[in-house]
UniProtKB/Swiss-Prot annotation:
InterPro entries cross-referenced by the UniProt entry: DNA_clamp_sf, Pr_cel_nuc_antig, Pr_cel_nuc_antig_C, Pr_cel_nuc_antig_CS, Pr_cel_nuc_antig_N
PROSITE patterns: PCNA_1
GO MF annotation terms: DNA binding; DNA polymerase processivity factor activity
Transmembrane segment boundaries: none
Gene for this chain: pcn
Biological role stated in the UniProt entry: Sliding clamp subunit that acts as a moving platform for DNA processing. Responsible for tethering the catalytic subunit of DNA polymerase and other proteins to DNA during high-speed replication.
Quaternary structure, from the entry: Homotrimer. The subunits circularize to form a toroid; DNA passes through its center. Replication factor C (RFC) is required to load the toroid on the DNA.
Protein name: DNA polymerase sliding clamp
Family assignment from sequence similarity: Belongs to the PCNA family.
Keywords, comma-separated and alphabetical: DNA replication, DNA-binding
UniProt keyword annotation of ATP-binding present: no
GO biological process, one term: regulation of DNA replication
Taxonomic placement: Archaea, Methanobacteriati, Methanobacteriota, Stenosarchaea group, Methanomicrobia
Amino acid sequence: MFKAAINAELLKDAIASLAVIVDEVRFKIKPEGISVKAVDPANVAMGIFELGSSAFEEYSADECEIGIDLNKITDLLGIADRNDTVRMELDEGSNKLLIDVGGLSYTLSLLDPSTIRAEPRVPQLELPAKVVLNGADLRRAVKAAEKISDHMLMGVSGDTFYMEAKGDTDQVRLEMGRDQLIDLKAGEACSLFSLDYLTDIVKPTNKVNEVTLSLGRDFPILIDFEIANGAGRISYLLAPRIESD
């Protein structure tokens, strides 16, 4: 059993955060909320999504798992106004999700979860540096880097966090000292990341006041932020681009 009501803009943002990684996901539904763990086909980026029951206007659920085509539900939610309420109910007999939004009623066919890639194991990483900054600053640096290169260097040197992109002839660099950051745990960190992935991953952070980046040297980066006034969380783990000498 699953029955819930949620703000349309919040649901759109949640779905968009997953759609940058994969097209199909397994939603794990429990009485305390919904969670998803997914990895992209190239095994470069992982998304971890949690939305507690308190993020919903109404929420009632037994433990179950459903498969959702993110492109379909994204198109469906496209007609919703930001302040609309989306009402959802699982019809277990037909394996469909009944959705009401903006006076319109939809029946969304669900996927068999067993046909979708299983949840990945989340690696336990010791990442020595941690940076907390405003999401808009992160988005701005990535947008600037896109114009120069297809990859971006991110690291910590002393009390300074930096993001840098170098092209054949041009270069862009953003440095933020401890006083410009919300928080900084200094540590040895310098890794190169693909902007093909970073560009999409940081899009949801533009509305976020605090984004936490955990970094190491030639290690994956963990990008973590809260949504729904702390009732939900989105995390991305992005593998570094290793260049041969």
